[in-house]
Amino acid sequence: MEIETDQSIEAMDTQDTQEVEILTSDLQQTQQQRNSPPQLPKFKNLIQPQLHAVGAVTQLPSENGNMPPQQLLADSSSTSFGDGEAMGIDDESKEDQFRSETTFSFTVENVVQLKSQRLSPPVYVRMLPWRIMVIPNDRALGFFLQCNGENDSPTWSCNAIAELRLKCHKPDAQPFTRARIKHLFYSKENDYGYSNFITWQELKDSEKSYVHNNSITLEVHVVADAPHGVLWDSKKHTGYVGLKNQGATCYMNSLLQTLYFTNSLRLSVYRIPTEADDSSKSVGLSLQRVFHELQFGDRPVGTKKLTKSFGWETLDSFMQHDVQEFLRVLLDKLESKMKGTILEGTIPGLFEGKMSSYIKCKNVDYNSTRYETFYDIQLNIKDKKNIYESFQDYVAPETLEGDNKYDAGVHGLQEASKGVIFTSFPPVLHLHLMRFQYDPVTDSSIKYNDRFEFYEHINLDRYLAESENTLADYVLHAVLVHSGDNHGGHYVVFINPKADGRWFKFDDDVVSSCRKQEAIEQNYGGMDDEISFHAKCSNAYMLVYIRQSELDRVLGDITESEISSDLVERLDLEKRIEMARRKERGEANTYVSVHVILEENFEEQHKRRLFDLEKVHPRVFRIKQNQTVDELVDLFVRGFGVSRQRMRMWNLCTAQTQKFSHFDFVAEGSRTIEQISTSQKPWVIWLQLAWTDVPGPLPPFNPKTESLLFLKYYDPRNKRLNYIGCTQQPHTRRLIDLVPDVNSKLGFEPDTELTIYDEYADKKLVNLNEPIESALFIPQDHLQGHILIFERENVDAKLDLPTVGDYFLDLVYRIEIIFSDKCNPNEPDFTLELSNRYNYDQLANAVAERLNTDPQKLQFFMCINNYKETAGNAVPYTFKGTIKDLVSYTKQSSTKRIFYQRLSLSIHELDNKKQFKCVWVSSDLKDEKELVLYPNKNDTVKGLLEEAAKKISFAENSRRKLRLLKISNHKIVAVCKDDIPLDTLLKSNESITTAQGAQKTFRIEEVPAEDMQLAENEFLIPVAHFSKELYNSFGIPFLTKARQGEPYGALKQRIQRRLNVQDKEWENYKFCVISMGHNADVNDNTPVDLEVYRSWTSGQLPFFGLDHINKSRKRSSLNFSEKAIKIYN
């Protein structure tokens, strides 16, 4: 298996290194049984065996004993090898060295006198050499199968099953055989078999006729899986490529292959608009990249960029996630990316089916029906023989009777039938087999490996309420398989890409063809027989079926012409850049990178110095170290289109001071780059080019008598420091003599007074009438590149930064800040360079100018630097501090980030409002979303709910009544009355903390119609979920109506209906009443005592507890880091 790492190191899958199973007591590894085993003999040292090539070997082995693959020919001729022969019998093409199975034999002569190990010539299966190995001992004959015996590499492995046979020379007699062997062959265990295959006494028994003319014939039938860690070309052998494993992402790889071969989905993914997306954060673009490489690439495809686009950290990628949850999250993300485009509706159009849940009373005319959609179906497999029994169990009606009667409102408790029926099935049907279920005995989730049959073709018409326009005939498209237990394991997928019966196995980076039996029957589970690669713990956990009538649409071929040319060009460019980087890394020792800076780079710099090495975009030339300076200059001539006479080279001596030394490429022309290049990597030079409006060559430069000066001008009105050119001046000239030339460059009057500064001296020059050499303190080593800054005298003092000194001081305080939209994470971030002395108004004006909006309709939030940077407290518009105060808590090297939010009202209007964050929960308790409301500061809960009603979409028949709840640690701690002032509510929320430090939130929800009116004997009681211990609470708590004295059985029935929990799952729930920290178990006949809930005065609000397993939590052995799967971008 190819492990995807930064170094692309190949290593074996951990699943592949599991212990092998000993099939019988005398079936052992030869390495453990031999006493001082000899080195594997080479063929030239053997007593030459005789070889009859019956579809096997026609030439002598090579010097090292290996038979080259090209020498495996279908030939009926024979070649003599001495006292033995090997025969290959292959039902498939005899020239196919990539075949998955074959039968071959080896005749051993002089067997009675056999004293040493014998090896047969190799026969190739899956591109690996397989040999029969014979090892005699005192009591019996040892018979082994060897794989790839000459290869000492630790990375290869191959899984195989084989039958070892001793042929009988009697007509129509059956060969002698032992139990089939099943083994993972790798470098340390490259042979497997029986050390005591048959005793000498039994072998020599003349009645059994095993020995004929002092010879025996041994035969092997071997079936091998595709090998890992060898040069296995999946594309060549199958036409498909695999996916690299990041360490524990085989669960994701199998699912991605399944989605890739859902061709209509793949085509829609190609068409997602991603032109403006950030390549590192776009899930759509990353999936496009993976699909495109799978379709057109020749090598296994990496997924690191995809998981990075998910926003996953390293730990997330190396954890085994729940596959069903990951599939749902990924499809939801794709569906959201397609909204608002022509692709909207693609996901439900492929995967969405519909069902109705019903309750029908037997004795009164009262029915309840609810219609739902689904993207997948969970089938119970426990105690079920096959897929039809599971579907029948899914739709089987349940009778509600006795203590479990249905509460039919005004009709009271009634006997009823309850069940579901499908109304339509989707084109692509995802079936999740419930291999992992809660076990009440162990009180944990376990994996069921029971045998469960599924079929290549199924019909589901009998499970529909009414027949659809086309038959519900389905063809099996993919079988996703898990090997292991509930703590982890390995995932592979078998796919029938064209639904034509040709199956392929996708095992991370290795793809191989396989038999239909291996893809289907051998994944039923409950087997550990001799004909299957799979152990008992290896079985199907998910099936993908495609509707027969939709095959052409779902599996239609996709050509490159159907993919956007812009996308193809972008992906090709990425690939070329990556290849160039790899090539550059590989040639780093033989090449030198020359970074060429031009004057245009100086013009981009408006700060100190001439350029910023971290931000400048130099022209890069790569040249071999043994090439000459003349050849480098020739590159410049061709690259810039200028003659040698119109260019001059300057070495950057130090990046810090940015001083240059003149490089005479004429004098140095014959020297090699290796001889003249500095220790600076890369080699940075400034290439001075003659100005296009100045004809002729550059004037000669004498570093002993001349100085190179760079000139800048400070523009106080635009607060910019502009580069205006360079000049070479004799040391004897005065600085004041430069003023007329500078005025001319700037278009000023010749007598305009200018002040001159030396940038490095960081002060105004006062000795302007002295020669340049003494005025600038030209050093003896003649480093060049003094920067002179000119500014006009008598500038308006009212300007923000009237002098260059003011400007430089401002630069000291400037920082780069990233601005992120708090409410819209998909909105691209932007960066502004601002002074950390800016006040709130200056900050708002700068951001508003960038966003082209009103600064009064922006609100800012400080950034919290936790696991992921998130928005913290809002910054009041009356804030008297500076930007420095907003970002000063971050580390010096950390990113400075501020969140912003666009407002629908002015920030001043907001001053009279109070921001109130809460959560809105839908009536089915499935959807949550954050609400940010702005009620008046002195408002009550009633005003808050009125404000919330403006932002909530109600159903047509809704009574539009809302209520506010306080939630802590997944429990309801208070039902807030309408007359409570919001100030009181918020202050009490801040002052109360729990022992666990649980965060309290407010929740707004619609009041159900049945809760509107409460009789004297009725009360709304809180309900909460927990697992085993009260502190392990989870999920969404809620209120439900209870009646004084009614049995808890009736209350539980109403809760089950509201939560839509299946009966079989509901049986695993436990129930108790929690009051004052104590819990009391209740049964169906226990009467409800409302005083327990009404008499609360302080502390935790009493609640009715549902104790059950937390299914939302992913299965992981690393409990400390368990969290739901999320795709952040």
UniProtKB/Swiss-Prot annotation:
Q: Which Pfam families match?
A: MATH_2, UCH, USP7_C2, USP7_ICP0_bdg
- Location of the region described as Disordered in the Swiss-Prot/TrEMBL record: 1-20
Question: What's this chain's function?
Answer: Hydrolase that deubiquitinates target proteins.
The species this protein belongs to is Drosophila melanogaster
SMART domains to which the protein is assigned, alphabetical: MATH
What biological process terms from GO does the record include?
Answer: negative regulation of hippo signaling; positive regulation of heterochromatin formation; positive regulation of smoothened signaling pathway; protein deubiquitination; proteolysis; regulation of protein stability
MATH domain: which residues? 101-222
Record's catalysed reaction(s)? Thiol-dependent hydrolysis of ester, thioester, amide, peptide and isopeptide bonds formed by the C-terminal Gly of ubiquitin (a 76-residue protein attached to proteins as an intracellular targeting signal)
The identity of this protein, by name, is Ubiquitin carboxyl-terminal hydrolase 7
Q: Where is the active site?
A: 250 (nucleophile), 490 (proton acceptor)
Would the keyword Hydrolase turn up in this protein's UniProt record? Answer: yes
Q: Supply one GO CC term from the record.
A: polytene chromosome
Question: What range(s) does the USP domain occupy?
Answer: 241-548
Q: Which UniProt keywords apply?
A: Hydrolase, Nucleus, Phosphoprotein, Protease, Thiol protease, Ubl conjugation pathway
Molecular function terms, GO-annotated? cysteine-type deubiquitinase activity
